[in-house]
From Swiss-Prot:
InterPro entries referenced in this protein's UniProt entry, alphabetically: CIR1, CIR_N_dom, Znf-CCHC_6
Segments of this protein annotated with the region Disordered: 112-180, 254-290, 310-595
Annotated zinc fingers (CCHC-type), start-end: 211-228
Organism: Arabidopsis thaliana (Mouse-ear cress)
Residue spans of biased composition, Basic residues class: 316-331, 351-364, 584-595
Name of protein: Uncharacterized zinc finger CCHC domain-containing protein At4g19190
UniProt keyword annotation of Metal-binding present: yes
Coiled coil ranges: none
Sorted UniProt keywords: Metal-binding, Zinc, Zinc-finger
Membrane-spanning intervals of the chain: none
Pfam family, one: zf-CCHC_6
Basic and acidic residues bias: start-end ranges: 120-133, 161-174, 256-267, 414-428, 470-539, 547-565
An example Gene Ontology molecular-function term: transcription corepressor activity
Length: 595
């Protein structure tokens, strides 16, 4: 013991420096006193000694917990002070702003990092875990390690590429994989953030979907999207599912394979004879050609009757003839339409002249028949008609209606309407003289000639204007002259109407002068007196022929006055037309000279 103590010396603890007690004034030198029981190598092994390792550990833990408790108390005090400050500020602001701030504060914990979270340490830990996983997979494939030497260099290069591809993808703070250039071509040569923090990108407004398709293995779309090239392709793992979900497989599973299907039973003949069952190979079920009926109810054994063949041929011939007739008729109609479309104005005038001739013939026939019926009718029928007329019709009213009718006929402009009116007037007065009728015919022929000359003159003018190139100035002059002509024509028409009105007024005055004047205002008494006079006259002249002569003479005088008026009017019209024709010829000649 002593030798050991002297040779080795006393082992001092960390609290002693150079064999002196730092805490007290006494300096004890254990080397001088050897062989004592105060050796630290012995005392440190005791559990009750403060310098023992477990006691030192407990002390350190107690110190750390105490320091952490103090730190936590400080943080709580700081938070409390902040909260009190917030409440003071909130008391000063409005109610709406206070509610907004309170709601924001209620949700603010979602955006605060969890206490004790270090992103760098977490990232490093994840990287280590991935490394361990990769090493485990390489150690688990010993066959691959054995065959490495036997592979060529190209295969080794391919393995290196696969290892490069299997590099761990960079992830964000929450452990989600970030899109890289390898997966998305859009991100090639994209600008990077200077801070080095991985951020979410949307280059050129292209949405980068950080998802992987399970069918094709590409990034940017999922298995059900349209972008996937294998959208409609049936994968091998889906074939089993489709077969399992197919209802036909379930039906086949429920049915017995030995039993025939319904459509097969329908095709095969039945076994029971009452249900139409038969054996198709049976000789009594064979169809013979002799038993087949033809269309006409006979058998096909004999030849077809000749009468049927004849009837069929005649029917066909009739049909063909009908078709030919129809075709001929249609071709004729087409030719006629072509001719009518290509026909000139001369052909139209010819047709119009033919129609006029027909109308003249008809009017002559009507006139002859009316005159015959008028002459052949007896005196009794004349008396009856005269009595009816005197009963129902007022003579003054009849005169007024005749005058009104004549005025209307003069106002009508159309040429054919005027002709028709003249024919009516001729028929209405059968006792007109032959001289008057000759005069009317000559007058109408003159009017026709003047109209034909006028039309031909207009046609020549149109042809000349279409052939000769006219300058813009001459065209303007022509338009101005045509406007003047129209004004002159309007003035002439107005003069004609005024002349007609004056003539009608003069006629009415003459008639009123011829009528017997009376001072009685009562119209009924006047009508009675007129009727009495007519009766008296008729009774005095018992002979109806004398009465008819008297009637004819009165009519003749009226017709003479009308014919004189018409002749005056026609002369006026002819003179105006001649003046217009001369003025047009003069203008036409002046235009030709200018051109």
């Amino acid at each position: 013991m002593d030798g050991e103590g002297e040779g080795s010396g006393i082992r001092l603890s960390k609290r002693f420096a150079g064999g002196k007690v730092t805490g007290g004034s006494l300096e004890v030198d254990y080397k001088t006193k050897s062989g004592t029981a105060w050796s630290h190598s012995f005392l440190n092994q005791k559990p009750w000694h403060p310098l023992s390792y477990p006691n030192q550990r407990r002390k350190w833990i107690a110190e750390q917990t105490h320091a952490q408790h103090d730190r936590r108390a400080e943080e709580v005090a700081r938070e409390f002070a902040q909260e009190q400050e917030f409440f003071k500020q909130a008391a000063l602001i409005s109610k709406k702003e206070r509610e907004k701030i309170e709601t924001m504060k209620a949700v603010s914990f979602m955006y605060v990092r969890p206490p004790g979270y270090d992103p760098e340490s977490a990232k490093a830990a994840e990287y280590k875990d991935e490394k361990h996983k990769g090493q485990g997979s390489s150690t688990q494939d010993p066959v691959a390690d054995d065959n490495v030497g036997s592979r060529p260099e190209e295969s080794q290069g391919g393995g290196e590429r696969t290892q490069e591809r299997k590099k761990p993808r960079p992830k964000d703070v929450f452990g989600r994989a970030l899109p890289t250039e390898e997966e998305f071509e859009v991100l090639k040569n994209a600008p990077r953030m200077e801070t080095g923090i991985p951020g979410r990108v949307k280059p050129f407004a292209v949405e980068v979907r950080n998802v992987k398709c399970l069918r094709c293995g590409n990034f940017g779309h999922q298995s059900g999207d349209r972008d996937c090239p294998l959208k409609d392709a049936v994968m091998p793992n889906e074939e089993l599912r489709l077969k399992r979900d197919d209802p036909l497989t379930a039906i086949i599973a429920h049915t017995d394979p030995s039993e025939p299907l319904k459509w097969e039973l329908k095709q095969k003949p039945g076994l029971s004879p009452p249900r139409g069952g038969f054996d198709p190979d049976d000789p009594n079920q064979q169809i013979v050609a002799e038993d087949i009926f033809d269309e006409y109810g006979g058998f096909l054994e004999g030849s077809i009757p000749i009468e049927i063949l004849k009837s069929m041929s005649s029917d066909k011939k009739r049909k063909s003839k009908k078709n030919k007739r129809h075709k001929k008729h249609s071709s004729r109609t087409v030719e006629e339409t072509d001719e009518s479309s290509t026909g000139s104005e001369d052909s139209r005038e010819k047709r119009g002249s033919k129609k006029r001739k027909k109308l003249k013939k008809k009017s002559k026939k009507q006139y002859d028949s009316d005159s015959l019926s008028f002459e052949g009718s007896g005196s009794d029928s004349y008396r009856l008609s005269r009595r009816r007329h005197t009963k129902h019709v007022d003579p003054s009213a009849s005169l007024k209606s005749e005058v009104y009718h004549q005025g209307n006929s003069h106002r009508e402009k159309h040429y054919y309407d005027e002709k028709h009116q003249k024919r009516k007037e001729i028929v209405d007065r059968p006792s007109a003289s032959s001289d008057d009728s000759d005069y009317y015919r000559s007058n109408s022929s003159r009017k026709k000639r003047s109209e034909d000359d006028y039309k031909s003159h207009h046609r020549e003018r149109k042809q000349v204007h279409s052939n000769d190139p006219v300058s813009e100035k001459s065209q303007k002059q022509h338009y101005s002259e045509s406007g003047k002509i129209q004004r002159v024509e309007k003035e002439h028409r107005y003069d004609e109407r005024r002349h007609r009105y004056v003539d009608m007024e003069s006629e009415n005055r003459n008639r009123s002068e011829k009528k017997p004047r009376y001072d009685d205002r009562d119209s009924e008494k006047h009508h009675r007196s007129v009727k009495g006079k007519e009766k008296h006259v008729y009774e005095a002249s018992d002979d109806p022929e004398e009465f008819s002569d008297r009637y004819r003479s009165t009519k003749k005088t009226e017709s003479d006055s009308e014919s004189n008026r018409r002749s005056r009017k026609k002369k006026h019209e002819l003179s105006s037309e001649e003046e217009e024709g001369e003025s047009r010829k003069h203008r036409y000649s002046t235009n030709r000279r200018r051109n």
